[in-house]
């Protein structure tokens, strides 16, 4: 069981790397400061590994004991938490959507807490408030500063200054990757530390190594989404984006607070897009999909972990029956709504009657 828990955690760490690749280097790649995906992913891998080893220990304490009592987390619970979170994150990576590992990990831990009725609700509310406030602050800050740039017509056109901006942007991207290592590796190794499988030092070392590997092997599609599909931006705007994300996440990590780096960066990019194109940026399908995935994902990992605990550890078949019924009812309601809308469009276009 211990080996299975470690393998689950390392698999999850690889998926963290894939998601963090877009969050940290998507800006530099999208602005043209670094043109090849492979180089961007290598720089990301080095940054996240360094961040995990140097400063990844503080958030571990929050993940391991700040949401549910530490003694609740056994090896079996570790497998359930990591498995539920990894499945949610892996699905998002296949869709090419940048997703916060903090969301799915906390969601999985909450599912265990709900099953055993040992949830620290006040701490959870604080964490969720950070999930809302930090991306909104990033969005508002980048929108406001970008508007100032455009109002005062601040532009850098000389090739020499453009090269300097490119170097500064790469440095900012590296520090954003560093912040990802500080904040997100704890999501993979925190449950292992709580269960006593690894100490903090070994956990961050092994976790950091596999996060770096995941960035190299699985990060291409998410990198493309953040770098090319949401909006276009200059090197100066890229520095603003990466600097904002790195600063917010590093400060949060120092205080041991898990925050959604992927959402911070993506929200900053949307802020730039809105400053340039207005509210039309929200009409892009990729933005709408991202917002939906962000909302659904923590509830998905919560539901998976809750069901696994109820099925294999508590044999609480009544709760499982209720959850399955709710899911079937929700799916049926969604399907019915789509059918009604389709019928109304058909009547509007072709006229009524049978």
UniProtKB/Swiss-Prot annotation:
The chain crosses the membrane at residues 3-23, 40-60, 77-97, 125-145, 164-184, 197-217, 293-313, 320-340. Coiled coil: none annotated. Keywords: Cell membrane, Membrane, Sulfate transport, Transmembrane, Transmembrane helix, Transport. It comes from the Bacteria. Its main location: membrane. One of its GO terms (molecular function) is phosphate transmembrane transporter activity. The keyword Transmembrane helix applies. It is found in: Cell membrane. It is a multi-pass membrane protein. InterPro entries: Phos_transporter. GO terms for cellular component: plasma membrane. Belongs to the inorganic phosphate transporter (PiT) (TC 2.A.20) family. Involved in the import of sulfate. This is Sulfate permease CysP. It comes from Bacillus subtilis (strain 168). The gene is cysP.
